[in-house]
Amino acid sequence: MSNSILNLGSFACLLSLGSIVLWYTISAVLAWYPLRKIPAPSFLATFSYLWLAKTTYSGKQYWIQRDLHKKYGPLVRIGPTDIITDDPEIIKKISSARSSHRRGDWYLTGRFNPYYDNMFTMLEPGPHAKAKARTAAAYSGRDMPDLEVGVNAQLQTLIGLMRSKYASNTVKPHQPLLDLGQVSCFFTMDVITRLAFGEEFGYLKEETDQYGFLGEVRELWPRMSTSADTPWIRKFLFSPPFLKVLGPKPTDKTGFGALMAVAEHHVGKRFAPDAKKKEDMLGSFIRHGLNQQECEVEGLFMIVAGTESTASAIRSTLVHVMTCPRVYQKLKTEINLAVEEGKVSSPIKLEEAKLLPFLQAVIYEGIRMRPPLLGLFPKIVPDGGEEFHGMFIPAGTAICMNTSSLLRSTALFGDDAEVYRPERFMELEKSKRGEMERNVELAFGYGQYMCVGKTVAFMELNKSIFEILRAFDLQLLSPAKPCDVLSYGIFLESNMLVKVTESEGTEYK
């Protein structure tokens, strides 16, 4: 009798195992078949997310994705129902104002307060458009006459810190090296918190990572980016049971939870009965009908999304300038001449910076060489499917954007697209230059899915690059290896050590 029971149990186990194997095999074939004609970098990518997860977690995401289309063509399969492209026309079509392509579930990883949606995590075009309309006036500056004033205040703090602690001169010839990787994040964090909540968190003033937030987020980026690119991990991390036990809470002392508490505190003050109206982003949100909870989650998203990405663009621009003497001298000459001829204020205004052609070329080339965001940003093919490059793409397929490859396209940027050369923008007549700049701006999205923080990011870039190089000369400690670089949906640079020397004849006031 016991042997019969054991045999029956063994048979049941084998039957269960066989059923699982059969189910997985059928699922894999069904996933593989619709996109079978689209090349993939690995057989694993045709039926699983193992290749994509490995690529993302490796820290070499940018370099791997940059070379995909050279090997496999304009459409590459990176998952069972996922393809990636660097074709700007496809990217524009699926993101255009009238497109019916909704966002993929990948965007849900942007729930930095994981219990509520923000504008970024709204997947359907309709709700997303409504949310964007309510926040557009704040992000564009239309509702914020003092937008530039807020950036100027943090810029002056940055310049003051560099001058007092790091800048060498005849009186203080041996000052410590500046970690540009760290201080760039302090600057962008103080800018975004000043704009979002009406007061900065004081990262620059204290020269410390308040709440341990920046350090924790840097440690989390490999896991956050990998979970974004791997559906089953993403679903698990955002599941109610997981969040109930291990999700961030406002009572936490560090990280996302601590920042949630800070957002609740600042927003709560603005919804108090005796609160005064202010002309900042939060004030604009309130005037356009966002409730207290919505303001909290939007503010938190702004902080996370707008800090490291913009800081990375600042670092990329400066490090490329510092490692190219020709560009360094041209830019310094343009800056000095603009100051001497009285063409710029102190600090420079954005409208003045836009009139400096080589500064603009340097900024756009810096973004092109190392884009601030590297995420997949998938859009889902609607019912009926569509055809690209002679291949039918069925409904439900996620079309992802390959910014890494797009910004190195020889068709868009010339045969020397691999080379850092800002002069490529200077060589074009006005309309062609504008077209090339707009191609670079695809790094910030397009159409209805354009990054709402683009205006603020360009303001920070223009003002910080000009004013830092107006006030100082910068020299990398190690030009051969300027810093340590990893990419996880974003560039993370560290140990970017710089010797700072006060410039002569271009005093910053």
Swiss-Prot record:
Its EC number is 1.-.-.-. Keywords: Glycoprotein, Heme, Iron, Metal-binding, Monooxygenase, Oxidoreductase, Signal, Virulence. One of its GO terms (molecular function) is heme binding. Residues 1-31 form the signal peptide. Gene3D superfamilies: Cytochrome P450 (1.10.630.10). Disruption phenotype: Impairs the production of abscisic acid (ABA). Glycans are attached at N402, N462. InterPro entries: Cyt_P450, Cyt_P450_E_grp-I, Cyt_P450_sf, Cytochrome_P450_monoxygenase. Pfam families: p450. It is an enzyme of class 1 (oxidoreductase). Induction: Expression is persistently induced 90 minutes after the addition of the ABA precursor mevalonic acid (MVA) to the medium. Its cofactor is heme. Pathway: Hormone biosynthesis. GO terms for biological process: abscisic acid biosynthetic process. Heme binds at C451. Belongs to the cytochrome P450 family. Cytochrome P450 monooxygenase; part of the gene cluster that mediates the biosynthesis of abscisic acid (ABA), a phytohormone that acts antagonistically toward salicylic acid (SA), jasmonic acid (JA) and ethylene (ETH) signaling, to impede plant defense responses. The first step of the pathway catalyzes the reaction from farnesyl diphosphate to alpha-ionylideneethane performed by the alpha-ionylideneethane synthase aba3 via a three-step reaction mechanism involving 2 neutral intermediates, beta-farnesene and allofarnesene. This is Cytochrome P450 monooxygenase aba1. It comes from Botryotinia fuckeliana (strain B05.10).
